[in-house]
């Protein structure tokens, strides 16, 4: 991915307010200013209406075919089997997709922002916007083109494993929360409060007994929370720059595990084993590493 200067393209459903568009762009750019601009990226903001999302998906198809003559209108535009945005009307949330694939010519990042969980009126929406940008940052340091085969598996491996959220989500969440905590007018104890809340998931993680690296999105454990604590632990050990800059700089060339060993001082299994013992302490002790 190239370093791309300038704002991302934003496309919003007709029932999305200008204030939501402005807020999304503002917090996206706070993150890109802090971590570097990567792209090209498009932000698609979904509203609350099935009618407006249908129009948005028509626009998606128009934009895709305009930018890429290889785009498959039959399968990669909204159809009876798949749609890019409809589920967000009911489910909410946000996501990043990487359209860095061998069967298309125009490669880009897609950021989809839903209308709820969190809603644009919540402070969490600001953090989620930055969280999604950190996923762009992560993927921007991986050059493998997705061919639905070996290259796809390599990209997944460099993110911490297919369907394994521990590192990718933990990194995005901690970096976003850390950056938000440093913004003007954010209360001084914000980050400790957030991490205290995430510590409620520690007991269920330890009781469940499944290794952190093996947890999937469907396991009944808040893996995002534990991953966030793991990254806080790593950052405390080696420093923010080593985690965010140096590890990712070597990720593509060395691969996940070798870059992990080089910059964090041990392999991922050993570090997680050490972390699993450390995290058994009282929460007050754990919070001492949080700035």
Whereabouts are the PLM-identified features?
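Active-site-proximal alpha-helical
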Residues: 31, 166, 171, 175-179, ...
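Zinc-dependent metallopeptidase catalytic helix centered on the HExxH motif
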Residues: 88-195
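Surface-exposed intrinsically disordered loops and tails
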Residues: 77-101, 147-158, 208-215, 244-245, ...
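Extracellular/periplasmic catalytic domains that process cell-envelope and extracellular macromolecules
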Residues: 3-4, 37-38, 101-104, 166, ...
């Amino acid at each position: 991915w190239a370093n791309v200067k300038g704002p991302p393209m934003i496309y919003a459903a007709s029932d999305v307010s200008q204030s939501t568009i402005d807020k999304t762009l503002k917090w996206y750019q706070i993150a890109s200013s802090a971590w570097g601009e990567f792209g090209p990226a498009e932000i698609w903001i979904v509203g609350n209406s099935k009618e407006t999302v249908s129009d948005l998906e028509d626009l998606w198809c128009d934009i895709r075919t305009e930018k890429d003559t290889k785009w498959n209108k039959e399968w990669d535009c909204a159809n009876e089997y798949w749609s890019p945005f409809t589920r967000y009307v009911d489910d909410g949330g946000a996501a990043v997709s990487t359209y860095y694939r061998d069967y298309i010519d125009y490669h880009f990042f897609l950021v989809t922002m839903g209308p709820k969980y969190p809603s644009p009126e919540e402070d969490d929406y600001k953090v989620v916007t930055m969280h999604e940008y950190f996923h762009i940052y992560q993927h921007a340091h991986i050059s493998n083109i997705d061919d639905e085969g070996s290259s796809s598996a390599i990209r997944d491996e460099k993110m911490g494993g297919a369907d394994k959220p521990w590192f990718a989500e933990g990194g995005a969440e901690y970096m976003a929360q850390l950056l938000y905590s440093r913004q003007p007018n954010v209360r001084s104890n914000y980050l400790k409060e957030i991490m205290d809340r995430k510590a409620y998931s520690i007991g269920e993680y330890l009781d469940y007994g499944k290794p952190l690296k093996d947890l999937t999105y469907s396991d009944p454990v808040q893996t995002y929370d534990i991953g966030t604590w793991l990254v806080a632990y790593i950052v405390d050990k080696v420093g923010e720059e080593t985690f965010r800059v140096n590890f990712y700089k070597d990720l593509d060339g060395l691969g996940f595990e070798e870059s992990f060993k080089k910059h964090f001082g041990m392999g991922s299994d050993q570090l997680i084993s050490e972390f699993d013992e450390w995290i058994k302490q009282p929460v007050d002790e754990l919070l001492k590493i949080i700035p």
